[in-house]
Amino acid sequence: MSKKRLHEIAKEIGKSSKEVVEHAKYLGLDVKSHASSVEEADAKKIISSFSKASKPDVTASQAVKPKEVAQPSVTVVKETGSEHVEKTQVSKPKSRNFKAEREARAKEQAARKQANGSSHRSQERRGGYRQPNNHQTNEQGDKRITHRSQGDTNDKRIERKASNVSPRHDNHQLVGDRNRSFAKENHKNGRFTNQKKQGRQEPQSKSPKIDFKARAAALKAEQNAEYSRQSETRFRAQQEAKRLAELARQEAKEAALKAQAEEMSHREAALKSIEEAETKLKSSNISAKSTADNRRKKQARPEKNRELTHHSQEGQKKNKKSWNSQNQVRNQKNSNWNKNKKTKKGKNVKNTNTAPKPVTERKFHELPKEFEYTEGMTVAEIAKRIKREPAEIVKKLFMMGVMATQNQSLDGDTIELLMVDYGIEAKAKVEVDDADIERFFEDENYLNPENIVERAPVVTIMGHVDHGKTTLLDTLRNSRVATGEAGGITQHIGAYQIEEAGKKITFLDTPGHAAFTSMRARGASVTDITILIVAADDGVMPQTIEAINHSKAAGVPIIVAINKIDKPGANPERVIAELAEYGIISTAWGGECEFVEISAKFNKNIDELLETVLLVAEVEELKADPTVRAIGTVIEARLDKGKGAIATLLVQQGTLHVQDPIVVGNTFGRVRAMVNDLGRRVKSAEPSTPVSITGLNETPMAGDHFAVYADEKAARAAGEERSKRALLKQRQNTQRVSLDNLFDTLKAGEIKTVNVIIKADVQGSVEALAASLVKIEVEGVRVNVVHSAVGAINESDVTLAEASNAVIIGFNVRPTPQARQQADTDDVEIRLHSIIYKVIEEVEEAMKGKLDPVYQEKVLGEAIIRETFKVSKVGTIGGFMVINGKVTRDSSVRVIRDSVVIFDGKLASLKHYKDDVKEVGNAQEGGLMIENFNDLKVDDTIEAYIMEEIVRK
């Protein structure tokens, strides 16, 4: 039996769902909400209950019922006695219906207008109330008046809730005119048991009273019914609109499908005509027929599979006895989906049956006359370059006997043979190593002869220590550089530029100490002219000879400046004669070298020296092209804590600009800032100009070449490639153990090493220190430089020193506070210096202390045993007398008997009489005991000696 939901019943009878739920509960049905379901019989019972519209008791007053509206339930309570008062309870509406209230008030006003003389009769009624007839009437009248006042109060409260109007105005309407209009009806229905006695002379008659609550409830129910009918009408209109919209949508969809089908038919017809045209042009019908057969077979296979699937499903259905309804629904959905899928497949199959689109012919391209190839090009790359199909090239290679695919690399010979077959001239591409900076210094063909201009000469000042090199530069620059140098010697290269007679001269100041040989050689390699300073009082010194050799090796002209001619012992002629022995011959003697006698301290003949420099530069014809990208050499490099790597560069060709991508040695970067020799920021540097730059990712080596690249990407690639090559070269230089050097390697393991970590302010000082320390010769000990770098001593250096048991040497640098604290904690030694030869001396002493000490025996004295005493639990005590030297408590002794040493050991005790003493002198007597020896005899000789350490020289 089917079921109905309560909200469906409410919709059917035009009632609210809440009323239907209440009626169902009243009838004893187990329902919870409007969504609850009831049986068909229960539904009919609910509908019939609404149609009957159950009435109250006969004795109770009833309200007027509108058509098809259920009367609200009214409960009447009667009181017996003289008062005869009735109490009426009316179910309150759930919500106020203002429209119903307005209609009720309109009806009341219309009834009031129809009444004649309402105001006059009401006045008489008021006067009648004031005239009581007798005691009984007054008593009953008082009671009725009291009851009426209570009724009026209740009526007023009901009217305030219903109409939200003035209670005073409502009182007149309800009590006056409405009572007269509905007097007969109220009396007939018996709503009111109390009669209004005011203004009447019949105190015992009972006039009916209007039940306004019931009236309002009836109006409310009528309005609800009207609203339900309107809602149902709107709902049916909406449903009809939806149905019409759905029909319109389906019609539009069918029209679109029809148009699409027509378009597909036109397309199929066009494709069919194209296929017929192509079949006429094809010479071979066999291939077309086989293709069609294959397509028909492919179409037949799915049908066969579907038939097999259908039969298998029927068999399964026969075997299965019962099917679940839910499974049937799901299978039905799947079957519909498969049906749609088959339809789509059918469309695709239909499209596959149509002829394929004609292949557009490739546009013809002329073959190039020349083809530049590289080793290892693939077939696809060659085809793209000559604008041919890869399959065509593969075919040609196959005819040539070469099996290749389009992604296979070909060698140069195969590519040349292939190009000959095509009639193209093949040329191998000359690959340029972008990471090779040295090619710019070896080949100058990239320079433009039209842009070559004269450049400033680069002059290097060389000479022995304290011969006046820095003093000369100080005089030239009018600055005090020499006073800032530690120990009066120059520690690293300084590059400066001065102007003389409108022309610029760049000076490089090189150190004169023996440790800076590599720096002097580097200075000579970048210079144009060398000024060799020789002190007139000292003459030629070892570093002077070294500077001469460097200049000759670099092939640069030499100008000799004989300095300190103001000193009393100056002898310039001796200097000229000594230099002649090394091939430096003055022009006065018929040579090619210019000699100038100067006094750098007193600024004597300085102008003459500068004029000589400009004259030699003019003879050398120094030229440069400032328009090309800059190249040059690193003069010095250091690491700054705030700025990072700082490199002093000497521009040799081109112009260096800020933001230029640059490769310096094995590192790369971009020129972030540029500072000249005066400490001023500049935006560009022309040839022969020294500048300091920042922006490198690492600190380069002094003497490295640099070059500016077109973009940062190329500079990065070149820098990384150079760094990779340097690392590979370093690994190749690692010594491998072989049978030939196995003995030397094992022997080297016996040599003690002093591990050092070098940190300096500039790269040149690092190189000089490392080279000098390695050259220290102490037999059995060598220096091992664990790490060397520029910059302050940091925590990582201390950690490395602790791990390798090394000493940290700081040259013109200081440790950070954190590094100093860590060094104190880890007990790592840090030595700070500013003069190089003191570093060398200190390390040499440490190397000597590393060797095992060498001891030499020293005899202190001799003694003769005069008497022996044997003491139990102690041993033998020998009484002796010193015959030579002395015997000490901490000395070793030998027991000699018959000129044969029978024991060698330590003294256990030494006494003079009963006192323990440290030594017994010559011609004194005493007693002694020897450790682990009790075989002392009279006349044994006791020889006392010690081992002394020999100081190494």
From Swiss-Prot:
Keywords: Cytoplasm, GTP-binding, Initiation factor, Nucleotide-binding, Protein biosynthesis
GO cellular component: cytosol
Start and end residues of each stretch annotated as Disordered: 52-247, 279-363
Residue ranges, compositional bias (Polar residues): 191-207, 282-291
Low complexity bias (residue ranges): 322-338
Compositionally biased residues, Basic residues: 339-348
Highest taxon of the lineage: Bacteria
Region (G2): 488-492
Subcellular location: Cytoplasm
Region listing for G4, in residue ranges: 563-566
Stored InterPro entries: EF-G-like_DII (IPR053905), IF2_II (IPR044145), IF2_N (IPR006847), P-loop_NTPase (IPR027417), Small_GTP-bd (IPR005225), T_Tr_GTP-bd_dom (IPR000795), TF_IF2_bacterial-like (IPR000178), TIF_IF2 (IPR015760)
PROSITE patterns: G_TR_2, IF2
Binding-site residues for GTP, renumbered to this chain: 463-470, 509-513, 563-566
Classification via Pfam families: EF-G_D2 (PF22042), GTP_EFTU (PF00009), IF-2 (PF11987), IF2_N (PF04760)
Family matches, as Gene3D superfamilies: 1.10.10.2480, P-loop containing nucleotide triphosphate hydrolases, Translation factors, Translation initiation factor IF- 2, domain 3
Composition bias, Basic and acidic residues: 80-89, 98-111, 140-188, 229-247, 300-317
Region described as G1: 463-470
Cross-referenced NCBIfam families: IF-2, small_GTP
Similarity comment text for this entry: Belongs to the TRAFAC class translation factor GTPase superfamily. Classic translation factor GTPase family. IF-2 subfamily.
Known function: One of the essential components for the initiation of protein synthesis. Protects formylmethionyl-tRNA from spontaneous hydrolysis and promotes its binding to the 30S ribosomal subunits. Also involved in the hydrolysis of GTP during the formation of the 70S ribosomal complex.
Protein's recorded name: Translation initiation factor IF-2
Organism: Streptococcus pyogenes serotype M5 (strain Manfredo)
Taxonomic lineage of the native organism: Bacteria, Bacillati, Bacillota, Bacilli, Lactobacillales
